[in-house]
Regions:
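Basic nucleic-acid-binding interfaces
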Residues: 1-33, 37-87
Length: 87
């Protein structure tokens, strides 16, 4: 059984996920946070860059903004790891 905790997602993994969802990083001049946008979402995705892994409540909030379920994220995460192992 594959169990993925949202609190164990690294910044690099979350950035890869955002890019795969069509999000674009915006330079907001704040080095402690990253801001990502995507057409069609109501708020920007923001997370701290000095806390790795990303806290679970930040992950939940950002997935809610993207209108993506935890299950969809976990399927993406597991699929990505499977592709990496096959390579």
């Amino acid at each position: 059984m594959n169990t993925v905790r949202l609190g164990n997602i690294s910044i690099a993994e979350f950035k890869a996920f955002l890019e795969s969802m069509g999000c674009v990083r915006v330079d907001n001049g704040n080095e402690g946070h990253e801001k990502w946008i995507k057409p069609g979402i109501t708020r920007p995705i923001i997370f701290q860059t000095h806390i790795d892994p990303i806290p679970e409540f930040i992950m939940r909030n950002n997935l809610r903004i993207l209108e993506i379920s935890r299950k969809e994220f976990v399927e993406w995460h597991i699929g990505k790891k499977t592709k990496t192992k096959k390579s």
